[in-house]
Curated annotation (Swiss-Prot):
UniProt region (Triple-helical region 1 (COL1)), positions on chain: 633-661
Associated clinical condition: Multiple epiphyseal dysplasia 3: A generalized skeletal dysplasia associated with significant morbidity. Joint pain, joint deformity, waddling gait, and short stature are the main clinical signs and symptoms. Radiological examination of the skeleton shows delayed, irregular mineralization of the epiphyseal ossification centers and of the centers of the carpal and tarsal bones. Multiple epiphyseal dysplasia is broadly categorized into the more severe Fairbank and the milder Ribbing types. Intervertebral disc disease: A common musculo-skeletal disorder caused by degeneration of intervertebral disks of the lumbar spine. It results in low-back pain and unilateral leg pain.
Residue ranges, annotated region (Triple-helical region 3 (COL3)): 29-519
InterPro entries xref list: Collagen, Collagen_superfamily
Region (Disordered): 26-521, 548-665
Purpose: Structural component of hyaline cartilage and vitreous of the eye.
This protein's name: Collagen alpha-3(IX) chain
Organism listed in the record: Homo sapiens
Lineage: Eukaryota, Metazoa, Chordata, Craniata, Vertebrata
Length: 684
């Protein structure tokens, strides 16, 4: 038992070795040829349109294009709508001191101010001292003054006379010259003396020296309006003052005249791609462009499925009936005629109406074929007849036998068109005949009715993207579209620097004090000051008509007491517009405005020339399709009669028939029937 168990692993190893050797000896063969294509499968149903994908990321900015040629100035556009007043910007830094401008002309007098005394003005310069005044009148005597203070001790008096001793004295007299004694103590103040008499008028004193200029007195009451003086000399420009506060926004002015269109500037760099706006309205179709140059013919695509037959068109209208031809008598069978000579080219005859069908005579013996005649000129195409009633469907015809290809004969004279026969059933399709030589190009038939939409063929391979065509010429300028709606107001840009300070104007005439109003509104000012302004203008006009004569300088009046401070004045009228400031830095990009209306469609550019791409790899073999079911298509619309075909080769001479019998009764009946129909047609 131990022997067989030990041999089992060895047998397994030998079997595995043989299997591995056999597997190594096998090699992979060459791939076989592709199998035949399977039948086409059923056309798939149209899939549901997918949802619109999210907008793609904005692409990188393209290179800056070459600057275009400046275009012709366009027509002046309609005046724009008045803009919206912008927000008040911040005051810019003061500008540099400009050169003094020319002095402006004297403006009209301003409106009088509101009631109330203004703030006192700055002290004026000291005036020139006037001439000395004359001798004034003697004033009245003044009141008695208070007792004065004791004066200082006076100088020692002169020596007194020698005194005399009184009687009984034994003393000697003092010498004549005695030394002065010491000064005595100050005496008591004396009593008020009696009032002295009024002294006489003294002499006129000399003019004193010019005193120092006194302090400026308070502003006096405003005087009446004086005459307008002559225009003074132009003063020196004052120093540049600090920038004033920004005044209130002025009233909106009338829209200005649109200026001439400027030259087209250089093309700027492409900005960031904006958000996709809503779909605009369909624009008006533009003018038809010039036909483009035909591109090279592309490679034939995959053949599509046969479309369904079109709806049968309406039958053409029945043509005018031809004039009745004289019915010929039925003759006996003629002998074979001699070959006739080639007839000369006949003139083009008028197209006659179709005659009535005569009774078919017995077949005569075929004549000897004559020489082929000269081909006649091609007749003009007749008018298309109106659509007639649809006839009943005839029985299906027997399948024809495939004929041999004949030689192309010369074109014969056009035959008279026969009457339109009844429409027969669609016959079975016979075997395809051999392709004949290409005939002469026939007259173009009228466009048939459009057929039903054929089944969708299999989608072809996607060709390579052709190169973009050259840019078309600039089309004519379209008519100006309606003005678009104004966009959203953008963020106000930073304020520009302050403009140069203008030359101070000539001070106007001081107006009369107005009546203090309750409200300093514009309407209130107009109501209060309308008449006063008219009166001031009338007075000014009257004074201007008079000759100007400088008046004498009046005496300065006494300085009045300072008046109480008046109420603050109302906001003045907006001043004249200053010069334009420097251009500020470019503002930030605003939000994209609403999408404008779609413009007119431009002219169609020239067709681009496509390039044939490289042939693609052969695709994998499709799955086996389901065999399709064939359906007979609908009959197509009958086309217009084509040009007469080439005459065929003369046929073989047939067997001679039996002699016929001439029966004139049928001919007479045909004649009578034709005359009756002719008269009936005329009467109708």
């Amino acid at each position: 038992m131990a022997g067989p168990r030990a041999c089992a692993p060895l047998l397994l190893l030998l079997l595995l070795g043989e299997l591995l050797a056999a597997a190594g000896a096998q090699r992979v063969g060459l791939p076989g040829p592709p199998g035949p294509p399977g039948p086409p499968g059923k056309p798939g149903q149209d899939g549901i349109d997918g949802e619109a994908g999210p907008p793609g990321l904005p692409g990188p900015p393209g290179p800056k294009g070459a600057p275009g040629k400046p275009g012709k100035p366009g027509e002046a556009g309609l005046p724009g709508l008045p803009g919206v007043d912008g927000l008040t910007g911040r005051d810019g830094p003061p500008g540099p001191k400009g050169a003094p401008g020319e002095r402006g002309s004297l403006g009209p007098p301003g409106p009088p101010g509101l009631g109330g005394k203004g703030l006192p003005g700055p002290p004026g310069e000291a005036g020139v001292s006037g001439p000395p005044g004359g001798i004034g009148l003697r004033g009245p005597p003044g009141p008695s003054g208070l007792p004065g203070l004791p004066g200082p001790p006076g100088p020692p008096g002169p020596p007194g006379h020698p005194g005399v001793l009184p009687e009984g004295a034994t003393d000697l007299q003092c010498p004549s010259i005695c030394p002065p004694g010491p000064p005595g103590p100050p005496g008591m103040p004396g009593f008020k003396g009696p009032t002295g008499y009024k002294g006489e008028q003294g002499e006129v004193g000399k003019d004193g020296e010019k005193g120092d200029p006194g302090p400026p007195g308070p502003a006096g009451l405003p005087g009446s309006v004086g005459l307008q003086g002559p225009r003074g000399l132009r003063g020196l420009p004052g120093p540049l003052g600090p920038p004033g506060d920004r005044g209130p926004i002025g009233f909106r002015g009338p829209p200005g005249i649109p200026g001439a269109p400027g030259k087209a500037g250089d093309r700027g760099e492409r900005g960031p791609e904006g958000f996709r706006g809503p779909k605009g309205d369909l624009g008006r179709p533009g003018p038809k462009g010039t036909p483009g140059v035909a591109g090279p013919s592309g490679e034939p695509g995959m053949p599509g499925k046969d479309g369904q037959n079109g709806v049968p068109g309406l039958d053409g209208q029945k043509g005018e009936a031809g004039r009745n031809g004289a019915p010929g008598e039925k003759g006996p069978n003629g002998l074979p005629g001699l070959p006739g000579r080639a007839g000369s080219k006949g003139e083009k005859g008028e197209r006659g109406r179709a005659g009535e069908l005569g009774e078919a005579g017995p077949s005569g013996e075929p004549g000897v074929p004559g020489d082929a005649g000269m081909p006649g000129e091609r007749g003009e195409a007749g008018h298309r007849g109106s659509a007639g009633a649809l006839g009943p469907q005839g029985p299906p015809g027997a399948p024809g036998v495939r004929g041999f290809q004949g030689q192309k004969g010369s074109m014969g004279d056009p035959g008279l068109p026969g009457p339109q026969g009844l429409r027969g059933d669609v016959g079975d399709r016979g075997p395809g005949g051999a392709a004949g030589p290409k005939g002469d190009q026939g007259i173009a038939g009228s466009d048939g009715l459009p057929g039903d939409k054929g089944e969708l063929g299999p989608s072809g391979l996607v060709g390579p993207k052709g190169e973009s065509g050259s840019r078309g010429e600039l089309g004519p300028k379209g008519t100006q579209g309606p003005n678009g709606t104004s966009g959203v107001q953008g963020v106000p840009g930073p304020p520009g620097p302050l403009g140069l300070q203008g030359v101070p104007g000539v001070p106007g005439i001081t107006g009369k004090p107005g009546v203090p109003g309750k409200e300093a509104s514009e309407q209130r000012i107009r109501e209060l000051c309308g008449g006063m302004i008219s009166e001031q203008i009338a007075q000014l006009a009257a004074h201007l008509r008079k000759p100007l004569a400088p008046g004498s300088i009046g005496r300065p009046g006494p300085a009045g007491p300072p008046g109480p401070p008046g109420p603050p004045g109302s906001i003045g009228h907006p001043g004249a517009r200053g010069p334009p400031g420097y251009r500020g830095p470019t503002g930030e990009l605003g939000d994209p405005g609403p999408r404008g209306n779609q413009g007119d469609r431009g002219d169609k550019g020239a067709a681009g020339a496509g390039l044939d791409g490289p042939e693609g790899d052969q695709g994998p073999q499709g799955p086996q399709g389901v065999p399709g079911t064939s359906k007979d298509g609908q009959d197509g619309a009958p086309g217009e009669p084509g040009p007469p075909g080439d005459p065929g080769l003369p046929g073989a001479i047939g067997a001679q028939g039996t002699p016929g019998i001439c029966d004139t009764s049928a001919c007479q009946g045909a004649v009578l029937g034709g005359v009756g129909e002719k008269s009936g047609s005329r009467s109708s």
